[in-house]
Amino acid sequence: MYPYTNYHDALFRQPNNLVNDVEKAVNGEYSAINCYSKLANMAKNEEERQRILEIRQDEVKHFQQFQQIYVSLTGRQPQPKIVEECPAAYLNGLEFALKDEQKTVDFYMEIADTATTEHIKEVFRRAAADEQNHAVWFLYYFTKHK
């Protein structure tokens, strides 16, 4: 056996996984932006509406950062698509959002742990911290209205 195949696989697999993960992150943020617009419109009061719009603005920032990373890795613009539909009822939407944010924290930390540059690591670590904060707010509103 020649060990070179393993080195080749190790060298080229990780960046492809990174590209796929960044593309998945772009789509996730794109979906969240769409969903949080709907949730903000269903909010029970102005304070909740404003907080959800602030969360949405964080998602726009993440979306833009992830797009830039995708372009730097591939040389082309991503073609974002909605990958998860937002529930039509407010309470269901809050539950959906808090679960999605929690899963996203883990996903972004995995990307940060395996990323190839410090810039990518830092962007995803910061985004993971933001997502954790978002989950807390969604949990608060979900618990409040349940």
What are these regions (language model features)?
Residues 1-146:
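Non-heme di-metal
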